[in-house]
């Protein structure tokens, strides 16, 4: 059981999230894709978001914009990045993905070319008790981010979802599935020419993350 468990749990890799083949990963290609780009990570201070930031720090990006509503976790992330990645050009931004004005401010000021959208409420029991907040953040927040990405010409938008969105049986899973449907519908509308834009949307589902905190 221990060996099986070890094989199933591994670190988040940027190359997995960017839609590359799982076999024969070309890290040089990933580096070329991100080189000189401004990258925005929402939920940057959460478990998955912060790990994405750490992974991005190893690539030759132009700037990393870390966006999160949680002040203390963001402060801790800032201290870590400053200590471990001294050459990394990053900016911590406090804000809520549910706020169109704040999101527009971020896109208008930094013009990210790649977005990793990890901001979400994810704890199942809490969301059962607070369904409206799950919908506001996971669905409406995703819509605000996706629409802004298209408006500002983002090249790639990676939505971090959950395996609980598969045949969802709880509020959290339903909210993430709705967010997936919106992103997929927007992507299809762009392909059909119904919405003007060139943003490529990718959805990546995660299972439970060990030692996770809020996203």
Q: Can you name each region flagged by the protein language model?
A:
Residues 141, 211-215:
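Substrate-positioning beta->alpha
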Residues 117, 121-181, 185, 191:
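Conserved Rossmann-fold NAD(P)-dependent oxidoreductase catalytic core, especially the SDR/UDP-sugar
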Residues 183-211:
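Conserved beta-loop-beta element that borders a ligand/cofactor-binding pocket
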Residues 42, 67, 115-119, 157-162, ...:
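SDR active-site strand-loop-helix element
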Residues 1-5:
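Short, small-residue-biased leader/transition segments that mark boundaries at the very start
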Residues 7-111:
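N-terminal Rossmann/SDR dinucleotide-binding element
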Residues 92, 134, 201-204:
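Hydrophobic/aromatic anchor residues within beta-strands of the central parallel beta-sheet
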Residues 61-62, 152-156, 198:
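A short helix->loop->beta-strand "cap" motif at the edges of active sites that frequently abuts
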């Amino acid at each position: 059981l221990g060996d099986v468990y070890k094989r199933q749990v591994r670190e988040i890799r940027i190359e997995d999230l960017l839609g590359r083949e799982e076999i024969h990963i070309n890290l040089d290609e990933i580096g070329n894709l991100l080189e000189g780009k401004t990258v925005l990570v929402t939920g940057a201070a959460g478990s998955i978001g912060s790990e994405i930031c750490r992974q991005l720090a190893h690539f030759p990006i132009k700037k990393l914009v870390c966006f999160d509503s949680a002040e203390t976790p963001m402060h801790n992330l800032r201290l870590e990045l400053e200590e471990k990645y001294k050459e990394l050009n990053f900016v911590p931004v406090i804000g809520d993905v549910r706020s169109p004005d704040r999101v527009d401010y971020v896109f208008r000021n930094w013009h990210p070319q790649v977005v990793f959208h990890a901001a979400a409420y994810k704890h199942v029991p809490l969301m059962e008790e607070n369904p409206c907040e799950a919908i506001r953040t996971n669905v409406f927040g995703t819509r605000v981010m996706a629409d802004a990405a298209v408006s500002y010409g983002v090249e790639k938008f990676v939505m971090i979802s959950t395996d609980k969105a598969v045949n969802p049986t709880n509020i959290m899973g339903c909210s993430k599935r709705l967010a997936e449907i919106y992103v997929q519908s927007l992507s299809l509308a762009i392909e059909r020419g119904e919405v003007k834009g060139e943003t490529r949307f990718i959805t990546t589902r995660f299972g439970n993350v060990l030692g996770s905190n809020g996203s």
